[in-house]
Amino acid sequence: MRIIARRTLREFADSLAGQKNQPAVKAALDAWFAEVSRAEWENTADVKRLYATASIVSAARIVFNIKGNDYRLVVSADFEKGIVWIKWIGTHEAYDRIDVAEIEHGE
């Protein structure tokens, strides 16, 4: 899958600089990016095979647990085009305050 935009993941990890869990969060995001980049998902069932704990919000909106569910990553997927768009990343606590179906990148 082609992921747009990796920079969002890097900036989020960088924003945690100085926190003791920052290296673990960065490693988890790098691992997610590598796995999804190699994936060739055709549908949400393919996503669930690789990420059983992922939440399928709609046919195109997926939520991934990052670093043991400490963080949430919301993406939109176009399986036909093989593209995943990063919409939002944050703590589990912040995730509880967003509308996952409507959130857009930069909000």
Regions found by a protein language model. Give the residues of each.
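Basic, Lys/Arg-enriched alpha-helical interface segments
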Residues: 1-70, 78-83, 92-107
